């Protein structure tokens, strides 16, 4: 064998030339205990709260507890292959999710990874899931309506862009239905939607995605799903991920709607984590910072000022109550954080009054500034007339000899209740809401039988569309009900009534 020294020396010289004295420093620790999705790690003196940790086998964890002699971390993946004695590295990063228009029409998990089988998400932009909410100076007051397409909400508890409105009610009262209808109603309104499913059955989420697809709403919607079968840490970070995806659009001057369905399960997932991390339990076994858990999430909803692009992020958190108990711990917390609540009642729902919005307990703390002028002008009496109806209906059960005035108030209340009923997945454009509410509040429905109100409404819209198309067009474009428009509407209703009663 012929050795050539000059060749060997040139290779060695080349390697010496390329040698660099760069050290790769990483803080490492050792797993001392792993169970229930929680790992305790010895070492990692420089770990930060919320930092990502790298475990063997491409599993990541997140630091939640910094104790004297160890670090408590939650695992964001399968813990099967993690054992005591394994080496863990810090990454110097916190949890990030992909953001941008590539996420529209997609279903992702809490880490932003696609789970809809439509291939990878083409985006180079990432955002940290936790962020300090915009300050007072960065915001401006809510003044643009976000139409839900639901008459009972848009007339009595209007929602503005940048508001946080809680949807609260028992199981099976139509909470998710209101949220989905609101998403469907944003078609063509230039609002991007994010639906965050926390701790729900995978089949339920699949049905929601299918519904959104059917109504053409998935094109402007991102679904972030952390189902009941997933680990508690993923359910815990899901709403923050959804919020981060929305903030990217908000900061580029767009309007975003985020639905958190629901925060009761989110709080339960956080309680699970906290108890496993041996944090001291408080009321209802929730940890002491469960208020901060939701306040730091919902406070990120905002309407930015014009210098920052004037974008908005509207939040509709959902809370599930037990037997209508609004004064439990989590419901009272979220009620105090949000700018109003839509309270859904089981009795109304079972009586066929759907959406089952209780007008007495539902409020919007933004109010009239989140309505178009036309709606503000005509929807005022509805709440009072409904309240009078409820009060009188209770008395009317006892006595039959009622005076004419009382009978009229009862009849008027019944008709208003009837026009507020609405089928699911049929949101109504605001101009048509204004027309039917105008007809009801101006007492044009008093001589129509209650059973015929729904068909009256349907046929009235058809009549106006064919003979007076300028009325809805005027309300839609000008957003006000001027004298001319009001006169035309009165004429249209009176002409239609002659046809309808004949």
UniProtKB/Swiss-Prot annotation:
Query: Ubl conjugation as a keyword?
Result: no
Q: Which CDD domains match?
A: ATP-synt_F1_alpha_C, ATP-synt_F1_alpha_N, F1-ATPase_alpha_CD
Name where it's found.
Cell membrane
Record's catalysed reaction(s): ATP + H2O + 4 H(+)(in) = ADP + phosphate + 5 H(+)(out)
Q: What EC number(s) does the entry state?
A: 7.1.2.2
Q: What is this protein called?
A: ATP synthase subunit alpha
Q: Identify its protein family.
A: Belongs to the ATPase alpha/beta chains family.
UniProt: ATP binding residues: 169-176
Sorted alphabetically, which PANTHER family does this protein's record hold? ATP SYNTHASE SUBUNIT ALPHA, MITOCHONDRIAL (PTHR48082:SF2)
The protein's role, per its UniProt record: Produces ATP from ADP in the presence of a proton gradient across the membrane. The alpha chain is a regulatory subunit.
Q: Which is a Gene Ontology cellular component entry for this protein?
A: proton-transporting ATP synthase complex
């Amino acid at each position: 064998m012929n050795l050539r020294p000059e060749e060997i020396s040139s290779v060695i010289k080349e390697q010496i030339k390329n040698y660099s004295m760069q050290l790769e420093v990483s803080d490492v620790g050792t797993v001392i205990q792993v169970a229930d999705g929680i790992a305790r790690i010895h070492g990692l003196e420089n770990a930060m709260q919320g930092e990502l940790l790298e475990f063997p086998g491409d599993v990541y964890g997140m630091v939640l507890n910094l104790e004297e002699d160890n670090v408590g971390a939650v695992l964001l993946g399968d813990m099967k292959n993690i054992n005591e004695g394994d080496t863990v590295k810090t990454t110097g990063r916190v949890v990030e999710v992909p953001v941008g228009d590539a996420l529209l029409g997609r279903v992702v998990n809490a880490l932003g990874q696609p789970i809809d089988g439509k291939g990878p998400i083409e985006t180079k932009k990432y955002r940290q899931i936790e962020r300090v909410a915009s300050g007072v100076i960065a915001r401006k007051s809510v003044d643009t309506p976000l139409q839900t397409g639901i008459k009972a909400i848009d007339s009595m508890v209007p929602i503005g862009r940048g508001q946080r409105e809680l949807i609260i009610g028992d199981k099976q009262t139509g909470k998710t239905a209101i949220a989905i209808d609101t998403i469907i109603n944003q078609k063509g309104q230039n609002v991007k939607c994010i639906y965050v499913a926390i701790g729900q059955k995978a089949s339920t989420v699949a049905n929601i995605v299918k519904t959104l697809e059917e109504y053409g709403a998935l094109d402007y919607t991102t679904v972030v799903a952390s189902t009941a079968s997933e680990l508690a840490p993923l359910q815990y970070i899901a709403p923050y991920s959804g919020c981060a995806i929305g903030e990217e659009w908000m900061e580029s001057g767009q309007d975003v709607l985020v639905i958190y369905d629901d925060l009761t399960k989110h709080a339960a997932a956080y309680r699970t984590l906290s108890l496993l991390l041996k944090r001291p339990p408080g009321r209802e076994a929730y940890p002491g910072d469960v208020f901060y858990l939701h306040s730091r999430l919902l406070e990120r909803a905002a309407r930015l000022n014009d210098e920052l692009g004037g974008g908005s992020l509207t939040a509709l958190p959902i809370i599930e109550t037990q037997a209508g108990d609004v004064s439990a711990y989590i419901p009272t917390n979220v009620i105090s954080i949000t700018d109003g609540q839509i309270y859904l009642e089981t009795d109304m729902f079972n009586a066929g009054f759907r959406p089952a919005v209780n007008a007495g307990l539902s409020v919007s703390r933004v109010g009239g500034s989140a309505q178009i002028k036309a709606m503000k002008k005509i929807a005022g009496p509805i709440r009072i007339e409904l309240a009078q109806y409820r009060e009188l209906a209770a008395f009317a059960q006892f006595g039959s000899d009622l005076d004419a005035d009382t009978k009229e108030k009862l009849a008027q209340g019944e008709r208003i209740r009837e026009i507020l009923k609405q089928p699911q997945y049929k949101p109504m454009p605001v101009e048509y809401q204004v027309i039917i509410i105008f007809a009801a509040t101006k007492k044009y429905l008093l001589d129509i039988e209650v059973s015929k109100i729904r068909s009256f409404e349907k046929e009235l819209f058809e009549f106006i569309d064919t003979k007076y198309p300028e009325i809805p067009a005027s309300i839609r474009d000008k957003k006000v009900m001027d004298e001319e428009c009001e006169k035309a509407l009165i004429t249209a209703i009176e002409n239609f009534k002659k046809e309808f009663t004949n």
